[in-house]
Amino acid sequence: MSYSQQVNKRRTFAIISHPDAGKTTITEKVLLYGNAIQKAGSVKGKGSQAHAKSDWMEMEKQRGISITTSVMQFPYHDCLVNLLDTPGHEDFSEDTYRTLTAVDSCLMVIDSAKGVEERTIKLMDVTRLRDTPILTFMNKLDRDIRDPMELLDEVESVLKIRCAPITWPIGCGKLFKGVYHLYKDETYLYQSGQGHTIQDVRIVKGLNNADLDRAVGEDLARQLRDELELVKGASNEFDHDLFIRGELTPVFFGTALGNFGVDHFLDGLTQWAPAPQARQADCRLVESAEEKLTGFVFKIQANMDPKHRDRVAFMRIVSGKYEKGMKLKQVRLGKEVVLSDALTFMAGDRSHAEEAYAGDIIGLHNHGTIQIGDTFTQGEDLKFTGIPNFAPELFRRIRLKDPLKQKQLLKGLVQLSEEGAVQVFRPLTNNDLIVGAVGVLQFDVVVSRLKSEYNVEAVYETVNVATARWVECSEAKKLEEFKRKNEQNLALDGGDSLTYIAPTMVNLNLTQERYPDIQFFKTREH
């Protein structure tokens, strides 16, 4: 198979949703269809049942939430699909945001009983930064749901994206009978209690087929025909150009738990979603068709293998082909590295990659030298842009139970901050260590990982910090004066960048007014 054929058959996507909309279940079922797992594990930790394949970190198993972004690759039809699993818990936004920089399309999962929820809105804002194409799955049809037309209206008005229904539900809850495919003129009939394996679904061809009335009952069949009249008049037709531009989303209905409808959106994904896209670097646009390898690191994961204290850097290949043993340049350090043992993933199971192509995600072993945002090339000096650090919204001071372990604590915190689990700030005027996060759960994760991985017991104390901003100034003299006068509110972050830590928002606003020449940033490029 030629290089361009290999690249064109790849689809790299992530699933975005509000917590508990059913994302982990959908991930399971997607892998089942891709033959990656033969029987889907029921997701919440119910002791004896199989754990979901993508939730492999210890704390995730205990809580039944996906904390870290796993990568899973599987074949489907003629495509090779890379699914990046993003943390579903409302606290884990920074990791999730960054993962969205490494995909070419997204599946938005909505709980049909609840509609559009707050976290979905935030994540959609991030996909807008790059106009990522979105597919939508209306989940939980086996429960009582809101009116489907109302759900489409809400997506359009709240998320500012047009909806084009591809399938339409017949009944819901205990009366859920299946879905009708608007473009194939076929009805797929649902049977309950078959969520763990792939079933042969009965198909009725034609909307006016008498078999349909017999299968779902005359009342529901009549209701379906009436609703479809309305849908065809009131909703958008699918338009591929608008989809690619991120302005229109194809909508599928189903139940992930009942394993129904998942294959419909997978068909849509492989048929319509873009193959690996070009990507902007600081000096030029890098096309996926280029044969020289380039890639960027969007995530670092500690200890995927508890037996070894290793860290793995996840790299999205933008162009070219990875081959075992090849030499690459790590642009930030200007040094050459030999990649002899890159990994491919099936969440938590690692296999050594012999080759990988643009669109794929590979894992690089990292002994502390790779950071988020690092670019690797075959010699060219370029840096991919758009991999952000977000200013934390929550802060705690961290204190050791055993003061003699200061060195291990610092090492652990720096490593965890490079990995993006948390941000660390060291005030200029004292020896405090302040930890910043986007969500409360990150604090728990850090303490539990410090204990299990670095053998350090730490506790948190409240600290008088409301927000943080990275500061820069083009004139060194003015920056020095600013530092001298505001020393008590300045800190260095994990990457030694100067940061203003404000006790209140009022303080921040006043400081910004007082120093118009100093720039205050909410995000920082890695």
From Swiss-Prot:
InterPro entries membership: EF-G-like_DII (IPR053905), EFG_III/V (IPR035647), G_TR_CS (IPR031157), P-loop_NTPase (IPR027417), PrfC (IPR004548), RF3_C (IPR032090), RF3_dom_3_sf (IPR038467), RF3_GTP-bd (IPR041732)
Domain tr-type G: 8-277
Swiss-Prot/TrEMBL keywords: Cytoplasm, GTP-binding, Nucleotide-binding, Protein biosynthesis
Keyword Coiled coil among UniProt keywords: no
Sequence positions that bind GTP: 17-24, 85-89, 139-142
Cellular component, GO annotation: cytosol
Gene3D superfamilies: P-loop containing nucleotide triphosphate hydrolases (3.40.50.300), Peptide chain release factor 3, domain III (3.30.70.3280)
Compartments reported by the entry: Cytoplasm
Molecular function as annotated in GO: GTP binding; GTPase activity; guanosine tetraphosphate binding; translation release factor activity, codon nonspecific; translation release factor activity, codon specific
Main subcellular location: cytoplasm
GO BP term (any one): regulation of translational termination
Cytoplasm in keyword set: yes
Pfam families: EF-G_D2 (PF22042), GTP_EFTU (PF00009), RF3_C (PF16658)
PROSITE patterns reported for this sequence: G_TR_1, G_TR_2
Main function: Increases the formation of ribosomal termination complexes and stimulates activities of RF-1 and RF-2. It binds guanine nucleotides and has strong preference for UGA stop codons. It may interact directly with the ribosome. The stimulation of RF-1 and RF-2 is significantly reduced by GTP and GDP, but not by GMP.
Entry's family note: Belongs to the TRAFAC class translation factor GTPase superfamily. Classic translation factor GTPase family. PrfC subfamily.
NCBIfam families: prfC (TIGR00503), PRK00741.1 (NF001964), small_GTP (TIGR00231)
Name of this chain's protein: Peptide chain release factor 3
